[in-house]
From Swiss-Prot:
Residue spans of biased composition, Low complexity class: 608-624
Originating organism: Leptothrix cholodnii (strain ATCC 51168 / LMG 8142 / SP-6)
One Pfam family here: HSP70
Presence of the UniProt keyword Phosphoprotein in the record: yes
Family the entry assigns: Belongs to the heat shock protein 70 family.
Record's keyword terms, sorted: ATP-binding, Chaperone, Nucleotide-binding, Phosphoprotein, Stress response
Record bears the keyword Metal-binding: no
GO molecular function: ATP binding; ATP-dependent protein folding chaperone; unfolded protein binding
Modified residues (Phosphothreonine): T200
UniProt feature, compositional bias: Basic and acidic residues: 625-646
Alphabetized NCBIfam families for the sequence: PRK00290.1 (NF001413), PRK05183.1 (NF003520), prok_dnaK (TIGR02350)
Top-level taxonomic group: Bacteria
Function according to Swiss-Prot or TrEMBL: Acts as a chaperone.
Protein name: Chaperone protein DnaK
Amino acid sequence: MGKIIGIDLGTTNSCVAVMEGNTTRVIENSEGARTTPSIIAYQEDGEILVGASAKRQAVTNPRNTLYAVKRLIGRKFTEKEVQKDIDLMPYKIAAADNGDAWVEVRGKRMAPPQVSAEVLRKMKKTAEDYLGEEVTEAVITVPAYFNDSQRQATKDAGRIAGLDVKRIINEPTAAALAFGLDKHGKGDRKIAVYDLGGGTFDISIIEIADVDGEMQFEVLSTNGDTFLGGEDFDQRIIDFIIAEFKKDQGVDLSKDVLALQRLKEAAEKAKIELSNSAQTDINLPYITADASGPKHLNIKLTRAKLESLVEELIERTIAPCRTAMKDAGVSVGQIDDVILVGGMSRMPKVQDKVKDFFGKEPRKDVNPDEAVAVGAAIQGQVLGGERKDVLLLDVTPLSLGIETLGGVMTKMITKNTTIPTKFSQTFSTADDNQPAVTIKVYQGERELASGNKSLGEFNLEGIPPSPRGTPQIEVTFDIDANGILHVGAKDKATGKENKITIKANSGLSEDEIQKMVRDAEANAAEDKKKVEVVQAKNQGDAMVHSVKKSLTEYGDKLDAGEKEKIEAAMKDVEEAIKGDDKDDIEAKTNTLMTASQKLGEKMYADMQAQQAAGAAAGPAGGEAPKSESKADDADVVDAEFKEVKK
């Protein structure tokens, strides 16, 4: 059985790790980096770039370069968060036929799971290159505050990438696993995991306990905001630069897509620099042009100014912290350790805010970029049966229920319930002789169903005619270990039942997923063909170079006919590598190889003759160095002489 890898599918960056025995290994990608930008670019020729290569070309290809797609996953186009992103993103966000938020690239609409699958495929390939074997199973992390639709969509992305997703686990929980197995001391401890990433914020209160030699990780509560992260911090800087430039130069950069992409890059860089220095220069020559000529942007940004720009964003993380503490029933004084996760947690102002709230210094010995992937790899080892000393008890982040008479949300499973879990409740009809009931499922904390997230609906039909309130309809909610919901309804009188796995009344259908899997496989096959063509071209080119060099040195030893034959074969290869026909390139390269055999024979004969001449001259030339070496007493000369003779 192959390894189960751990993948942190992040909004801004992604990371992959694997367990080797008792040690975790964060795997470097093909560029040698331990994290990969979650950026995907679609080229004109159909090539798909992922990671650093996609990020490098973003400025020149902004409309077809996708980033922060995780913020759209499992969301409806009409949601206010999506509408906010439409005005900010250089790429097009469109409504799918089912009402989901999709993206449009080069005239083609794509689902966020399909785009995220490209990043997952890169992570899969990274692991395969390191392990030297095929990888088919993974544990993928999601923000703890992701709802059912978002979890399901992440699982779909894994399938499209060719992965069997063994478990979806929450990012703070994964970070706690990494911390618990690496840094955790003796005895039971309560920890707070503050996870401020590129696009999402989570806070989880977790108890780590030693139960009969088994380390138990129990999530006491979780809270967060799935639309708050580093991307929002970048946007505050971009808005500031645009306002300053407009004030200074009278030009509005907000409508210039190319300029916006450069500003995005500069804002991210400035934000990172200001974590270590008090001031930075944002210098972008030729940012735009008007009738008077090119315009250059040069703005100084201080740490104090940045902090004032993002103060409200940092403050927004504190309310979920308060709620999580209250839900867990613990006071600040009972928290033993505060763990910081996510790239944004490196910002000094964020660290100060966390310290003020929890009344203690957060731990700095956990890598905020890698801890989540490491935790996922540990969970992979547990699921693979290689590790028996870890038990993970996670929770559902939001309450789940159904709509009942008057549009009320009747909660079946309350938030922060340990999963997996199952709960049943009996309901009845609202009207006389009602032949069917519609079960509408919602997720959220509001009292009225309409204020919560609709997850789906289904009907239970064939209820015998009877007065209202008489039929006994048992509704069962069952949440699996991935946090994904299954709902059933049963008429106790007739035994009729209907069950569904909640697929949001949007989401991808099975047919759509299968088509995307096939497209992904076709792309992989196409990529393989492209690589093979490149390799054939490289071999042909290397062969031409080698033969040319040999021909210059030994061509005069060949007769004219042989030389012409080789030159013609070289020309054929040079012509072939201008095209993309792999078989033709390989055939022409083989012809050149055969034609140049005579040249190889001449070279070999010439080298043998030289060696024979050198060996014959050896004894005569041996005396002088010996006498010199005695005079100079230099052993090195002897060694050199022996090397030549050999």
